[in-house]
């Protein structure tokens, strides 16, 4: 494997041709959300032709086939639940790294409808259990209502992403949740999340489903629950929200706060300017921030049998800020140009200034999301970069928000931070991205993980080399009280030249360019992943 350290390159240094960018966008999750799942098909995506015609009313643009959510050379359906003891390790697991690395992603039980998108598919959770230098691997499907109904029927019953009008009549009124997007540790449960439904509660150690529709002891008022709750850096409280909270297509958002013991201590309702995919949000010690973008609810497309969203080009964005703990009446919406922002790296308040670091593209980041105006998807405009959004709340007449690209030469999605700093000012961020300065520009850039230092604006790069696709990277602190950024980075690498076989790579977070401290070598391909979570040993001992 190759590695290097880099200063932030100029915008020109990061320029890619259309073919390379398409491969990088899919292969390094430079779109957003489930692009890590798409990443496993990166080798094929790099050779895909651009869409030749206008987008259809549903599904991917013409010429864009749906990529298998697993390894590049693997089968389109994976469905392997595994238990592997003492996985082979190259190198040495650090003695202070003990806990569990969890992952979740869509792994369809049955072939997807050809007009459906890769966001769909039943949630499959995996765990790398790390103890005393040894690693065990386990994976299990989330056994929720949807999974059990389809298993009994032995066929797909929910054929279109977030469109209940297409469901089989036998599942009318049944929860449609896939529980396939993210996971979080709460009250000794592993909550598997999908933003259109309540969570599913799993056992932290066995991954068996305990409650397929977990509603926090009846306290959850919203019909939905975000895939990206935040943990307060001081109290450990969980701040979360649901959009379309009063039902399908509604403009209601419910935001709330729950203690580590499970008590809801704050609850507020707000309205949004229009119904869009609010996949993530930002929380600081003082403020809540929502971002409304033109990936919008498309009622006509749904009536025509299509998916929930389409990109409504030309529609403005809105940066909404409200104070934590209030009733939401102080909510202010700041207007901006057409943009997409799907994930938050970190956020903080400095007096009345609010700062939110996000992945941001000029427009639709997803090649499989329909363009409402029928135009072709543009991979260049769909490229995401880490961008700082800000607003000065002391200026009562302020109508818009500011945008600053922090690292112009880097394109990527699925940003992360040290999660202990979810609501506090932070220094380090992490991102999967294509190599910003490949030696051979005629080839598809290698996949990298990058550590950004916001104080110096420098970047350190781990380069995975040829034939590898990297999933999202997650930070694990050395200890509960370790300084920010002192610990390890870990994530799954799919080996595209080995039929998609997977490795877990562990790096020194302070020196990722030095290469792996340890490589955990699975004999199989790991289950698909959108997001992952590190849970330290001291939290598992209470489970």
Regions found by a protein language model. Give the residues of each.
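N-terminal secretory signal peptides
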Residues: 1-17
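Residue-level detector of intrinsically disordered terminal segments
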Residues: 15, 36-37
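Beta-propeller domains
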Residues: 21-33, 49-543
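Signal peptide processing junction and immediate N-terminal pro/mature segment
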Residues: 37-50
């Amino acid at each position: 494997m190759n590695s290097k350290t880099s200063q932030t390159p100029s915008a020109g240094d990061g320029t890619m041709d259309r073919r390379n960018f398409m491969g990088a966008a899919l292969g390094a999750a430079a779109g957003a959300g489930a692009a890590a799942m798409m990443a496993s098909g990166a080798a094929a995506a790099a050779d895909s032709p651009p869409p030749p015609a206008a987008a259809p009313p549903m599904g991917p643009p013409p010429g864009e086939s749906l990529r298998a959510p697993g390894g590049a050379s693997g089968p389109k359906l994976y469905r392997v639940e595994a238990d592997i003891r003492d996985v082979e390790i190259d190198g040495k697991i650090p003695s202070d790294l003990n806990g569990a690395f969890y992952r979740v992603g869509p792994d369809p039980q049955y072939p997807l409808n050809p007009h459906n998108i890769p966001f769909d598919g039943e949630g499959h959770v995996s765990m790398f259990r790390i103890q005393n230098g040894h690693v065990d691997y386990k994976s299990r499907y989330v056994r929720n209502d949807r999974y059990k109904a389809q298993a009994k029927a032995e066929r797909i019953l929910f054929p279109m992403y977030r469109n209940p009008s297409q469901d089989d009549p036998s599942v009318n009124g049944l929860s449609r949740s896939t529980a396939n997007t993210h996971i979080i540790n709460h009250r000794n449960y592993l909550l598997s999340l999908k933003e259109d439904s309540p969570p599913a509660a799993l056992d932290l150690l066995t991954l068996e489903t305990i409650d397929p529709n977990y509603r926090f002891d009846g306290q959850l008022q919203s019909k939905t629950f975000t895939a990206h709750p935040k943990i307060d850096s001081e109290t450990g409280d969980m701040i979360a929200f649901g959009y379309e909270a009063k039902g399908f297509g509604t403009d209601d958002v419910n935001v709330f706060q729950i203690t580590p013991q499970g008590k809801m201590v704050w609850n507020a309702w707000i309205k949004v300017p229009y119904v869009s995919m609010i996949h993530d949000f930002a929380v600081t010690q003082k403020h809540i921030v929502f971002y409304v973008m033109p990936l919008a609810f498309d009622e006509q497309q749904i009536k025509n049998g299509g998916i929930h969203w389409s990109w409504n080009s030309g529609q403005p964005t809105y940066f909404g800020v409200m104070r934590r703990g209030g009733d939401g009446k102080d909510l202010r919406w700041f207007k901006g140009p057409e943009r997409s922002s799907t994930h938050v790296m970190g956020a903080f308040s400095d007096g009345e200034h609010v700062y939110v670091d996000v992945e941001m593209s000029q427009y639709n980041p997803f090649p499989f999301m329909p363009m409402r105006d029928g135009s072709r998807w543009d991979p260049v405009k769909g490229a995401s970069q880490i961008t700082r959004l800000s607003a000065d709340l002391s200026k009562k007449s302020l109508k818009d928000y500011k945008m600053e690209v922090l690292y112009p030469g880097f394109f990527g999605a699925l940003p992360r931070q040290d999660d202990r700093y979810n609501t506090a000012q932070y220094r380090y961020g992490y991102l999967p991205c294509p190599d910003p300065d490949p030696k051979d520009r005629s080839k598809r850039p290698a996949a990298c993980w990058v550590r950004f230092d916001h104080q110096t604006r420098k970047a350190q790069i781990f380069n995975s080399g040829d034939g590898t696709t990297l999933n999202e990277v997650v930070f694990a602190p050395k200890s509960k009280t370790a300084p920010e950024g002192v610990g390890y980075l870990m994530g799954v690498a799919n080996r595209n030249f080995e039929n998609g076989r997977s490795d877990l790579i562990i790096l020194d977070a302070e020196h990722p360019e030095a290469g792996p401290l340890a490589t955990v070598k699975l004999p199989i391909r790991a289950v698909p992943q959108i997001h992952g979570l590190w849970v330290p040993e001291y939290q598992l001992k209470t489970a």
